[in-house]
Amino acid sequence: MIRAGLRWLLAVFYFIAGVAHLCSPMGFLAITPVWVPFPPEVVAFTGVAEILGAIGLVIPRTWIGWARPAAGIGLALYALFVWPANFNHAFNNIPLGGVAASWWYHGPRLLAQPLIIWLALWAGEATHWPFRSKS
């Protein structure tokens, strides 16, 4: 019950974030590190990845058994790969919408990323750790 609720919450969050990446990419482009090639395309790709991952999380296992774990793994990798943008945002104090966030935002946000990675794996049923073994 808790896993299903968090799965839906995560799916809604990622779906909205994916749409935001596609409809309003400027904020995401602003925090993209300079070493990322083709930033507009990468931001668009990440938006599509978030939307597809969100959909994959809520596909019933009886329809496509591998979709949910694959979506969880994909969203976990996504969260890992966009982490540098969060560091870039924090350490370069990049304002979004004319407002610079303080470390009261950046600190917890950076520390939460491993939890977000685990949550994607757990909600997607790619792992059962630490609650029970997969057997």
Task: Give residue spans per PLM region.
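Membrane-interface extramembranous regions
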Residues: 1-135
